[in-house]
Amino acid sequence: MKIIFNADDFGISPGAVYGILESYKKGVVKSTTLLANSPAFDLAVEVAKENPGLDIGAHLTLTFGSPLLQGLETLTDDDGRFRKNYTALENGLADVDMGEVERELTAQIKKILGAGLTISHFDTHHSIEPLIYPIQHKLAEKYGVSIRRHADVSDFGAIKTPDLFETAFYADGVSFETIKKIVQAHIGTNDVVEVMTHPAFIDETLREISSYVEPRIKEVSILTSRELQAYLGQQEVEVISFRDL
């Protein structure tokens, strides 16, 4: 089997940037996805350019912060900010202009490309793929990238994806044992499994803007541990990135 440890939320805070960098340089993370509207976007771009082996994707969002474009009336609240989570977006989906969705996601992609980075894959913040999949599919074809294989989406066409997407390494599931269970479920197969991760060093920015905070430093510890790397080697698990699909 092969595993992609993808680090979501690149750029959400300086601590997240450096936590992901640590998990790449000393650990098993080879891919990360960048929030184009994030507070530490410029720092993330700088770090990405200094570490060209780190595979960069776009962490497309309609549920974090503010959009890059103005005038998106069906995607924002009275303060001009996105809805705060999947449920809020889903509940208002009937009123959402999908043209606005496509324009905003395109702007996010173009901002990352315009910063001089190459994108290999797309995923979404708060796993909103099922709500916007036709547009994500269209943009993935347009830009020639891979996408995350969300369980609630079945028709990927010619777009490359991992075979499976594992979300168990999150919150109370952040443990070495969780990764071992994932490996044991697929060992001896040709499956390519993406494991979602959110490593970060905790800082005030992260505390102010994210509800998922404390487990992130534990993720860094596990993803950089010699124990994990030795285990993956013993099980002959190949750690790859989205570039390798």
UniProtKB/Swiss-Prot annotation:
Highest taxon, organism lineage: Bacteria
Pfam families: YdjC
GO molecular function per UniProt: deacetylase activity; hydrolase activity, acting on carbon-nitrogen (but not peptide) bonds, in linear amides; metal ion binding
Keyword check for Cytoplasm: no
Keyword Magnesium applies: yes
Residues bound to Mg(2+): 59, 125
Swiss-Prot/TrEMBL keywords: Carbohydrate metabolism, Hydrolase, Magnesium, Metal-binding
Cofactors (names): Mg(2+)
EC number(s) reported in the record: 3.5.1.-
Family to which this protein belongs: Belongs to the YdjC deacetylase family.
Biological role: Probably catalyzes the deacetylation of acetylated carbohydrates an important step in the degradation of oligosaccharides.
Subunit annotation: Homodimer.
Protein name: Carbohydrate deacetylase
Organism annotation: Listeria welshimeri serovar 6b (strain ATCC 35897 / DSM 20650 / CCUG 15529 / CIP 8149 / NCTC 11857 / SLCC 5334 / V8)
Native organism taxonomy: Bacteria, Bacillati, Bacillota, Bacilli, Bacillales
